[in-house]
Regions:
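Membrane-embedded alpha-helical segments and adjacent helix-loop junctions characteristic
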Residues: 45-146, 333-441
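Hydrophobic transmembrane alpha-helices of multi-pass small-molecule transporters
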Residues: 1-71, 198-200, 211-212, 228-362, ...
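Hydrophobic, membrane-inserted alpha-helices
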Residues: 11-17, 109-113, 146, 203, ...
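Transmembrane helix-bundle signature of multi-pass membrane transporters/permeases
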Residues: 33-34, 110-116, 130, 147-158, ...
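Short, amphipathic, aromatic/basic-enriched membrane-interface segments that mark the entry/exit
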Residues: 1-4, 41-42, 97-98, 386-392, ...
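Short helical (or helix-break) motifs at transmembrane helix termini and adjacent helical loops
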Residues: 125-134, 458-473
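Transmembrane alpha-helical segments in integral membrane proteins
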Residues: 72-93, 201-218, 321-335
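Membrane-core helix-loop-helix motifs of multi-pass transport proteins
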Residues: 134-232, 246-258, 471-528
Length: 549
């Protein structure tokens, strides 16, 4: 048995429903995991509890997971030191004088997010740490900051030629049946497919329009109105106090450089360790015995794309913490006792996010894994529904986009969706183009748009899902209540997904990138004109009802 069929849908649906009903993400995730374990165990409560324990322990026993877990905790320690010394406050005050208004601070956050493209976790937490005080100064809602962070994480990483995401996609593409018939390298395939990644590119366009034209709608408009009228950066009545917010010290000793230096160190160390990890892994003790030989054995591009980002980020935060610790002591911004308190408070502030992250990994495992590995095999079940259906080539991109979005949203992982969908869709797309007798360029367009539909759907699901680790870390980086981030981002993500779906339908019909983008821009322009007006009209109607005698 490869899957549990429709039963696999229960855990993600239950988790998402409970999260919005109870406003308690941790309890909702726990009950979602438990429901999956009960299904896997055939209703046996003792076996379900044992499976639950194995899942939670397995999430932290995984080497990649534990390094990301430690990176997040130690980044919290760094943030604690930045706050304790007053460096974050000093930098925020300095930047607030340079960035005169909300538009400037949001655009600076957007640009910073584009620059830090090497890893989505690194992006969300680092950019959030730096830009949060500046956006707070200009009363930018935390939900808006979280949206910008989330939208410049996965959507940007999937477009960057050198990132932890690209190596994953290229490795799956390279090993997929039918790819060899295209006669191109995996990297060439990735580069040529970028224009077809409608969701990621439209998300970037959406951010710019929201920032410069202030075309907010839905729940985000309410967050903006709350910040403008009351100065509150999140709805404390609904979501309470944020436990991850670290109070900043009021001090005149810290300078803007005291904030910039640790962040620059983190970026430099991360960039340095990305290829270094590949070189270290290449040392086999026989043909390659040292770093110099390892570096000479591969190009810098190969070193970047074949690295293990979890090692690179973990080493980067360790070295950054050590240098920053000594630097602050030398600057007399804190003593040994204060440094210890800062590290402790910083790690403590990350505990809620770390618990949620562990739960998200666990529910992803029970949903994604096959029954032989103690999971439900939901992705396999959904993909089989498509494979068993009979449909023409033109509708394939739209179906693939929708299915990838559902899988990624339900499982909270885009990478898992890549692994499930690309090996299935590649041979289907190549086979259908061969059967249709398409010319080479048209056949290439068909394959590009089908695989880009997988990438776009997976990124949407990861972008919008409340159980996605990148969504969780964007909330953490912005110090925004997680459910407020989900509620405010969802309408934007769904709108961009609708634009992309229109593009994939049109692109599938004409097998042409220009027709796809024409459809995207028509739907996007119409929506950005109408949706803000609908939100204002709805708010006015509700206000009128409330004040009717």
């Amino acid at each position: 048995m490869d899957h549990f069929g429709m039963w696999g849908i229960i855990p993600p649906v239950l988790t998402i429903a409970l999260a919005f009903i109870t406003k308690d993400v941790i309890v909702s995730l726990f009950l979602g995991i438990l429901s999956g374990c009960i299904i896997v165990a055939g209703g046996n409560p003792a076996a379900a509890l044992m499976r639950l324990t194995d899942l939670l322990a397995g999430s932290l026993a995984d080497g990649w997971n534990i390094r990301i877990f430690l990176f997040c905790g130690l980044l919290g320690a760094l943030v604690g030191m930045l706050s304790k010394t007053g460096a974050a406050q000093a930098f925020g005050l300095w930047m607030s004088k340079k960035l005169k208004n909300k538009t400037a601070s949001q655009f600076a956050t957007f640009i910073f997010g584009l620059i830090v493209f090497i890893d989505d976790y690194f992006n969300s937490l680092t950019v959030g740490t730096v830009m949060r005080p500046i956006n707070d100064q200009h009363k930018v809602p935390r939900a808006k900051l979280a949206y910008i962070l989330d939208s410049t994480a996965a959507p940007v990483c999937i477009l960057a030629p050198v990132s932890s995401w690209v190596v994953t996609v290229m490795s799956i593409v390279r090993n997929s049946e039918g790819f060899g018939k295209l006669g191109m390298s995996d990297f060439e395939f990735f580069i040529r497919a970028i224009p077809y990644n409608l969701y990621a590119l439209t998300t970037i366009l959406m951010i710019l329009v929201i920032i410069f034209f202030k075309s907010d709608f839905g729940a985000m408009k309410k967050s903006e109105d709350l910040a403008r009228t009351s100065g509150l950066l999140w709805n404390e009545e609904v979501y309470g106090v944020i436990s991850g917010d670290i109070p900043e010290e009021q001090t005149t000793r810290a300078k803007p450089l005291d904030m910039l230096l640790p962040i620059l160190l983190l970026i430099v160390f991360a960039i340095a360790f990305f290829p270094a990890v590949s070189w270290i892994n290449a040392i086999d003790g026989t043909t390659i015995t040292n770093i110099s030989q390892a570096a000479a054995s591969m190009s810098i591009r190969d070193a970047f794309i074949n690295t293990d980002s979890s090692y690179a980020l973990f080493y980067a935060i360790i070295f950054t913490l050590a240098v920053t610790y000594l630097y602050y002591l030398a600057r007399r911004l804190m003593n040994l006792k204060e440094a210890s308190e800062a590290v402790r408070d910083g790690i403590k502030s990350m505990v809620p996010a770390l618990i949620i992250l562990t739960m998200a990994w666990s529910i992803g495992a029970v949903i994604r894994s096959s029954p032989t590995d103690g999971g439900l095999g939901l992705g396999r079940y959904l993909s089989e529904l498509v494979v068993s259906s009979s449909f023409p080539l033109w509708i394939l991109p739209a179906i693939v986009f929708a299915l990838s979005a559902v899988i990624a949203f339900a499982t909270g992982t885009s990478w898992g969706t890549f692994g499930i969908m690309i090996p299935i869709i590649m041979p289907i797309a190549v086979g259908l183009t061969e059967n249709a007798g398409l010319a080479q360029n048209t056949a290439f367009n068909a394959v590009f748009i089908c695989i880009s539909a997988v990438l776009g759907g997976a990124v949407f699901g990861d972008h919008a899902s409340p159980i996605s680790d990148t969504t969780i870390l964007s909330s953490t980086g912005a110090a925004c209540p997680h459910l407020e981030h989900v509620a405010t981002q969802m309408p934007y993500a769904l709108f961009v997904a609708s634009c992309s779906l229109a593009g994939f339908i049109t692109g599938g019909i004409f097998m042409n990138i220009l027709s796809a983008w024409l459809a995207v821009l028509v739907v996007f322009t119409s929506g950005m004109i109408l949706l803000p007006k609908i939100t204002v009209a709805k708010a006015g109607s509700e206000y009128g009802c409330l004040n009717t005698p």
